[in-house]
Amino acid sequence: MLRTTVVLLTLAAIAFAAPTSDDIYNNVVIGDIDGAVAKSKELQKQGKGDIITEAVNRLIRDSQRNTMEYAYQLWSLEARDIVKERFPIQFRMMLGEHSIKLINKRDNLAMKLGVATDNSGDRIAYGAADDKTSDRVAWKFVPLSEDKRVYFKILNVQRGQYLKLGVETDSDGEHMAYASSGADTFRHQWYLQPAKADGNLVFFIVNREYNHALKLGRSVDSMGDRQVWGHNGNVIGNPELFGWSVVAF
């Protein structure tokens, strides 16, 4: 009888053991975001938030696609304190729709919009050679959730226009990035996948319609600016080439 009692108590202890960072990590990887959120809330309540931080750091280091879904769900379900305390500040800036700058890792250029407009009123997106401070490089991320996925519309604050990829392609099958006043297509929607480059957090910014990640072209115009394109190919594993830093404006 005593032995049975000990076994039952041991099983009960296991059943009610606090979640581990592996538990949260695995939930996020397989897409069980609800499970990850529930475990995170429990840990935060118990004063064991460092376990959450450990899981978040691993998700970022491994460039896991569902990391933003996890953060968004916490943000949306009255657990913003977890995002503020356990995630890098960039997540809070994007989910909170703060003004930010997007700095390309490879060339250290901030994204801006050109002054000229085409026949549709669209503006070309560039990496600015000499501007990291004006309103032209200020952007906001506007989150939206659909089918358990999180996408963003990316708004240029000065122009009130949303970043998109054009329809036409070049000889490499790549689409040029523009901004337009409307934002009613999947070409205007983006998902973000975190990564580490030289120890710093960057994001792959991937278009929903074409699954192309943003990059800067290799050609330089007379002002030293580079056009923004969607890359036709895999970018995972190359954050130093295709990553973007999110910096407070």
UniProtKB/Swiss-Prot annotation:
GO cellular component: extracellular region
Residues of the signal peptide: 1-17
InterPro entries in the record: Lipoprotein_11, Lipoprotein_11_N, Ricin_B-like_lectins
Alphabetical keyword list: Signal
Source organism of the structure: Manduca sexta
Chain's role: Small vitellogenic protein found in females. It is synthesized in the fat body, secreted into the hemolymph, and taken up by developing oocytes.
Protein name, entry field: Microvitellogenin
Keyword Signal belongs to the record: yes
